[in-house]
């Protein structure tokens, strides 16, 4: 059974190439793996066929959103590689992502830069002569 032949001995190309559920849904994230995690995670007795597709698409969207913002943060810092600090800056500067991931600690992410108003130098109204 080598050479990509099935039980009948006919090549897979002749039968028609099998499409994964991810490719059918137009996703990059693995729908089959998400389905397996849902089944093995004891979240419910039964898992619908569209639930893993929906969850995989949500995970893919959130990942793309975070990576886009982190890429912008890396570019702002004149870096070509995204590091945990860029992820931290991207998430904490976005209101909705910060609310979603508010209790999440990112290792090596650092803290958000902030200087209290009272610590800033006072601006005088008169110009120095």
Swiss-Prot record:
Q: Name one GO cellular component term.
A: nucleosome
- Per its UniProt record, what CDD domains does this chain match? HFD_H2A (cd00074)
Q: Which residues, renumbered to this chain, carry the PTM N5-methylglutamine?
A: 108
Q: Give GO BP annotations, semicolon-separated.
A: DNA repair
Modifications after synthesis and translation: Acetylated by ESA1 to form H2AK4ac.
Q: What does this protein do?
A: Core component of nucleosome which plays a central role in DNA double strand break (DSB) repair. Nucleosomes wrap and compact DNA into chromatin, limiting DNA accessibility to the cellular machineries which require DNA as a template. Histones thereby play a central role in transcription regulation, DNA repair, DNA replication and chromosomal stability. DNA accessibility is regulated via a complex set of post-translational modifications of histones, also called histone code, and nucleosome remodeling.
The protein here is known as: Histone H2A.2
Originating species: Lodderomyces elongisporus (strain ATCC 11503 / CBS 2605 / JCM 1781 / NBRC 1676 / NRRL YB-4239) (Yeast)
Taxonomic lineage is: Eukaryota, Fungi, Dikarya, Ascomycota, Saccharomycotina
């Amino acid at each position: 059974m080598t050479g990509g032949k099935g039980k009948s001995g006919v090549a897979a190309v002749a039968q028609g190439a099998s499409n994964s559920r991810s490719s059918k849904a137009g996703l990059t994230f693995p729908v089959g793996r998400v389905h397996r995690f849902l089944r093995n995670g004891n979240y419910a007795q039964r898992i619908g066929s569209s639930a893993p597709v929906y969850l995989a698409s949500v995970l893919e969207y959130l990942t793309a959103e975070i990576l886009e913002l982190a890429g912008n943060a890396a570019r702002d810092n004149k870096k070509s590689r995204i590091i945990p600090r860029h992820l931290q800056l991207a998430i904490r500067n976005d209101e909705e992502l910060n609310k979603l991931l508010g209790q999440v600690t990112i290792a090596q992410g650092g803290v958000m830069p902030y200087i209290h108003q009272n610590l800033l130098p006072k601006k005088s109204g008169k110009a120095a002569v």
